[in-house]
A protein has these predicted regions:
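Trp/Phe/Arg-rich N-terminal binding region typifying the photolyase-homology
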Residues: 1-115
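Glycine/tryptophan-enriched, flexible segments
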Residues: 98-152
Length: 152
């Protein structure tokens, strides 16, 4: 994303990536321009599809479109998903087809839509990660001071 993450955010990210690496049995970590790194990862792994959680900031939407274009050129399926919202920003509209600008009418309309039933998690085929990328420590995410874990 844009901007620099603070110490607490970097500490959290370091430990979240470590837990994910443990759960998956490996994790490829890359640093660089996102689209170039994804092309490199696809080439190294032979992936036939990539998926990611959708972000809604304008720069992230533009990045997602670029990734789709890159992957289509490589013959790789690319798809983003809603990961954290009950409703996508474009799903709840006024009767005139415009976004709501006042919360209470939005809330009423959103409640009428209901909440989709969660789908079960897919089964994943886990493979050994390729010899590609950086170690978690190479990313330099875990600051030494202050100790963000003290008292937890």
């Amino acid at each position: 994303g844009r901007g620099k993450a603070g110490g607490a955010s970097r500490w959290w990210l370091h430990h979240s990536l470590a837990a994910l690496r443990e759960k998956l049995g490996g994790l490829v970590l890359l640093r660089g321009e996102t689209r170039a790194m994804l092309r490199e990862a696809v080439a190294a792994t032979g992936a036939d599809a990539i998926v990611w959680n959708r972000c809604y900031e304008p720069y992230a939407v533009e990045l997602g479109r670029g990734v789709v274009t890159d992957m289509q050129a490589l013959g790789v399926a690319a798809r983003s998903f809603n990961a954290a919202l009950i409703n996508e920003p474009w799903e709840v509209k006024t009767l005139a087809g415009k976004p709501y600008t006042v919360f209470t009418p939005y809330l009423r309309a959103a409640r009428q839509r209901g909440v989709a039933t969660p789908v079960p998690a897919p089964s994943l085929k886990v493979c050994s990660p390729p010899k590609l990328g950086l170690s978690l420590d190479d990313l330099g995410l875990a600051p030494k001071k202050p100790d963000w874990a003290a008292g937890w």
